[in-house]
């Protein structure tokens, strides 16, 4: 059915309230698409291009109907769409002109990827060299401290002390928490908080946005040699699950600090008592789960 069955948002106002640039175009007009993409490349803030399109465009009998999305058009309707769009090529045939342009873009992308990989490898080698020189000593010392004081420390406090030692030696670790830094103990005295206009930092306050936090951590891991970690209560790992699953599929170095993992949690009550979460996390392929 129509989108107004479920949505009444004013998307323009929503994104403008975020401080974004909003560009509205006809999504079926290639000139408008080209001009919009050209414009946003010069933008000084995040931009969303809103492409106004019609579902099932070109289909004489299903254009503008939800049925064009949920079910096949059918062979007869496909023939009519081809005629309507003046598309005179056989199925799976790519016109030479289009193929030529695709190949050009492919070569351009290949060159950019090659340059990026060289820079990435250079930085990775430099960082690995730094880690090898310092990390073994730091970890050994911290292990001895943790073992010595284990009876007097909560696990999350022991985690904080370990992070405190690691952050001091490793500028690739990017910490954060979904509005629970004080409870998760993910923030140390060596952290500098990320603020608008100041990204020379290594700690992000994500707010009550567990899913966004884990999605951002995936991006940090994929883009550079960062090792992001983020904290929340184990019960809220369910909000993180889609992004955790993607990180595991992509074999990314993303670390999740899930505290308060006991059904013995008192004042917060049953809504904060994890029961099935640990089993669920352990069932995800490529995800290593450690429960000290």
What are these regions (language model features)?
Residues 1-104, 269, 277, 283-292:
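Glycine-rich ThDP/TPP pyrophosphate-binding loop and its adjacent helix/strand module
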Residues 24, 100, 104-292:
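Thiamine diphosphate
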